[in-house]
């Protein structure tokens, strides 16, 4: 009897637990080829994410080897390399996780055309979100534009069954697994390590604090958030598994997971979210000020809470969610600069950088996106005093101000002249028009 073979193409689903495409292939086929194709074009976008990716691939390879298989690694055009390997091993077809980005859709179209040409199947599976994009549709539309009704509908969905990791995986004989390059250095010295095993340990360690999530997640100095976002972005942990471990679908933490699903279904219906204002008629009279953009990027705006957030981003490849809101609001609402360059800076540094969630969040803050109040502004001083009341977060990331006590650190321009002159810290950036209320 001829043994049946299938290829599973990994993309941003770098795990063996709750991986529908992998589980289906192992169940239906005698031999399975887990494959990842390193795309040189994508590797250049973010040294931080490239390092995290390579660490995650090494962890995935180890998990597959423990189960008798291996991760086959190739380098080049993902479609060409996948089809080439599938034909070489005599695969009947290819399975992979469905995705919503333009890049993913282009890959899918090309794969489908090649599979049709070579008489192979191409099957897409869920797994990148908890509820599949497109599974929920409002009356008269192809996607929800406002979060609250989406969340209500999302809460009522019967979720798919969470899948165990395969016990055994068998590769075809003679397949060269290929070399996985050593992880590159990356740009952020304190960036988290990638991999499913790291993600599962982090989730287990953090879960005991879940009951206090609503009280502690905005404490910038305490930093008691899950920090799971890079692992969700790369699929090192299943969002369904995280939701199941959290339990309460009405709770504030699971609500944040739902926001992730929400933006995936938005991008499925509006694929230009990373480049085009979502809100029809949105005003976009942005200023052009390269000096201000550079100062914001480097964390030297003279606004301590903003500079602290941007320096954390550069040091860790991650930023506290409250700091993301403050820094993005400062760029767009105070400096009056376009959200798109801000998005690109985040995308360059963030381990969890992706076009779906980052774009949705930036547009929300800028007033051009979903479920937004276009004239909402973030007072950075008020935000700092509320979420970093003693200034510990600022002093951690802006050492020039470590001698400034208490909440005075949030407004160094109000210090006595002699004290202020002794600090190696710039004054707040000047912008055209009247000074905002927090500088008066």
Regions found by a protein language model. Give the residues of each.
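Residue-level preference for long, well-ordered alpha-helices that form the structural scaffold
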Residues: 49, 53, 298, 302, ...
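Active-site-proximal binding-pocket segments
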Residues: 221-403
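Alpha-helical packing segments of well-folded alpha/beta enzyme cores
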Residues: 21, 56, 60, 199-202, ...
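Short charge-dense sequence patches
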Residues: 3-15, 32-39, 58-65, 189-197, ...
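Glycine/tryptophan-enriched, flexible segments
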Residues: 120, 141-284, 384-388, 392-440
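Trp/Phe/Arg-rich N-terminal binding region typifying the photolyase-homology
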Residues: 1-162, 249, 311, 357, ...
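Intrinsically disordered, low-complexity boundary segments flanking structured domains
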Residues: 22-24, 57-60, 110, 131-136, ...
């Amino acid at each position: 009897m001829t043994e049946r073979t299938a290829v599973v193409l990994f993309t941003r689903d770098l795990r063996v637990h709750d991986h529908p495409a992998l589980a289906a292939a192992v169940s239906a086929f005698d031999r399975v080829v887990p494959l990842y194709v390193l795309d040189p074009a994508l590797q250049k976008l973010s040294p931080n994410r490239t390092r995290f990716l390579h660490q995650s691939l090494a962890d995935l390879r180890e998990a597959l080897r423990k189960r008798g298989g291996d991760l086959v690694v190739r380098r080049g055009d993902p479609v060409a390399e996948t089809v080439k390997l599938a034909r070489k091993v005599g695969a009947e077809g290819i399975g992979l996780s469905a995705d919503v980005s333009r890049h993913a859709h282009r890959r899918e179209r090309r794969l489908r055309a090649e599979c049709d040409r070579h008489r192979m199947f191409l099957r897409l599976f869920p797994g990148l979100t908890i509820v599949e994009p497109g599974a929920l549709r409002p009356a008269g539309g192809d996607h929800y534009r406002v979060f609250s009704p989406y969340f209500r509908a999302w809460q009522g969905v019967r979720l798919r069954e969470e899948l165990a990791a395969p016990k055994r995986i068998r590769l075809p004989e003679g397949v060269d697994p290929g070399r996985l390059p050593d992880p590159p250095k990356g740009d952020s010295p304190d960036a988290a390590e990638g991999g499913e095993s790291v993600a599962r340990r982090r989730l287990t360690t953090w879960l005991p604090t879940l009951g206090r999530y609503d009280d502690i997640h905005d404490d910038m100095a305490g930093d008691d958030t899950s920090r799971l976002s890079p692992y969700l972005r790369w699929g090192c942990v299943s969002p369904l598994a995280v939701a199941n471990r959290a339990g309460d679908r009405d709770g504030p933490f699971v609500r944040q997971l739902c926001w992730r699903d929400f933006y995936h279904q938005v991008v499925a219906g509006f694929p230009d979210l990373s480049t085009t204002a979502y809100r029809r008629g949105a005003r976009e009279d942005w200023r052009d000020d390269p000096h201000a953009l550079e100062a914001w990027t480097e964390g030297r705006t003279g606004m301590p809470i903003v500079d602290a957030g941007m320096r954390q981003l550069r040091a860790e490849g991650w930023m506290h969610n409250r700091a993301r809101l403050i820094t993005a609001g400062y760029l767009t609402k105070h400096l009056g600069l376009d959200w798109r360059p801000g998005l690109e800076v985040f995308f360059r540094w963030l381990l969890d950088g992706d076009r779906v969630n980052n774009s949705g969040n930036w547009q929300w803050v800028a007033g051009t996106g979903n479920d937004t109040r276009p004239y909402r502004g973030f007072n950075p001083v008020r935000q700092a005093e509320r979420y970093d009341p003693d200034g510990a977060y600022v002093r951690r990331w802006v050492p020039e101000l470590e001698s400034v006590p208490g909440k005075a650190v949030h407004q160094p321009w109000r210090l006595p002249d002699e004290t202020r002159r002794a600090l190696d810290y710039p004054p707040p950036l000047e912008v055209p028009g009247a000074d905002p209320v927090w500088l008066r």
